[in-house]
């Protein structure tokens, strides 16, 4: 079960079909609109605003603004944003590096219902954030980062999904981020998009899971045509097996 952070302001819409419209809707919210929301939904909306501004999804990229949204989200119960702020201060993303601030916000994360000890929270978050930092500074590392997220998020129990959501990652966000990055034409990202589609990280095929496989083939074919060996092997296995 995936914990999906993007809760719409008016009504919940299929994110895989309406992301662009939703991003515009979020970006148009005023602080007054946000303040009028119930606390949990407000935190989720602020987290979503942080996400789209962090990566420039439907809005201009603005890491400084993203950090402010994440900070606000973190202060509303610790379910969202706290580890995003930790990352920013730890790696100097949109702000000067500050280990004290990084630790301060990490401690604000809500630990309720997390079936994982602090030692492993630190270990797993650090591994993912190291990969994220590489992807943030080197486009050639983006596909590897998405692959790590697929491994972390695919077919996990609810408790694991909750943990990864608390530190800033879920299936829907991973799909949206990979979709954005796939526009650069990286063959390896085409392959990762095939994996994401096959495993329905978008949630689009929840009611029709049999549609995910054919939808993924266009990505695998694109990757194979560009020389990605893993995609070529996968398609070879599919075609040889009928």
Predicted segments with their positions:
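Bacterial N-terminal signal peptides
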Residues: 1-8
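Boundary at the C-terminal end of the N-terminal hydrophobic targeting segment
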Residues: 13-17
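Short coil/turn and helix-start
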Residues: 39, 57-61, 75, 91-97, ...
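Helix-start (N-cap) detector for alpha-helical repeat units in TPR-like alpha-solenoids
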Residues: 43-44, 79-81, 187-189, 229-231
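Hydrophobic face of amphipathic alpha-helices that form TPR/SEL1-like repeat modules
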Residues: 46-55, 84-91, 130, 162-167, ...
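TPR/TPR-like (Sel1-like) alpha-helical repeat modules
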Residues: 100-114
